[in-house]
């Protein structure tokens, strides 16, 4: 795969001290700790809004811009990958049923089931020699844009970076 085939700008909302340290180079990208919560909707990783600096700013007190190479991306806008996700869910469901355990559920802003299925799919793929470096997915959020609309006012695309080598550089976005 061409290393520079899918380059995008991503925006990460975070604490101001963290943003400053990263942008000034006082904190290396390799020291950036990925989120590993059991409810992270795209699984474990460092989360970015694709082309969404204002949304990142709404979420965190400061914003770090990043040039991202999606690399080998589990792109959930592609039916090839959503089909894999559906298959992985069925496999997990079978295991949980056989063990008499309830599957985790998504509740409100907690995406425990999504997190489990994506992390397991990435693990299964890795065992087969396919290493997903990033996960990308649209997130429909907010009220309808107008009455009867399927478009939501706060919809966005998020990226979870699992391989820090995909973060080519960081910058201070001009939010002016």
Cite the ranges covered by each PLM segment:
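Short aromatic-glycine-(Arg/Gly/Cys) micro-motifs in beta-strand/loop hairpins
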Residues: 18-40
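A general structural signal for short secondary-structure junctions and capping/turn motifs
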Residues: 1-3, 37-40, 57, 149-151
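Active-site and NAD+-binding cores of ADP-ribose-processing enzymes
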Residues: 2-4, 8, 13, 20, ...
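Short, compact, well-ordered microdomains
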Residues: 61-65
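Conserved nucleotide-binding/hydrolysis micro-motifs of P-loop NTPases
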Residues: 16-17, 53
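Extended catalytic/binding region for NAD+/ADP-ribose chemistry, centered on the ART fold
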Residues: 35-60
């Amino acid at each position: 795969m061409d290393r520079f085939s899918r380059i995008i700008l991503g925006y990460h909302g975070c604490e101001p001290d963290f943003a400053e340290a990263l942008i000034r180079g006082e904190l290396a990208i390799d020291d950036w700790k990925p989120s590993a919560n059991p409810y992270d909707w795209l699984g474990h990783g460092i989360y970015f809004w694709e082309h969404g600096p204002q949304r990142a700013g709404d979420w965190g007190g400061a914003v770090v811009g990043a040039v991202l190479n999606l690399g080998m991306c589990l792109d959930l806008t592609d039916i090839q990958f959503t089909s894999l996700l559906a298959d992985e869910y069925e496999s997990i469901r079978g295991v949980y049923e056989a063990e008499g355990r309830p599957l985790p559920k998504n509740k409100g802003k907690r995406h425990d089931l999504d997190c489990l299925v994506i992390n397991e799919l990435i693990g299964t793929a890795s065992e087969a020699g396919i290493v997903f470096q990033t996960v990308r997915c649209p997130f429909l959020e907010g009220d309808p844009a107008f009455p009867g609309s399927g478009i939501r006012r706060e919809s966005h695309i998020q990226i979870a970076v699992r391989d820090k080598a995909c973060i080519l550089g960081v910058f201070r976005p001009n939010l002016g």
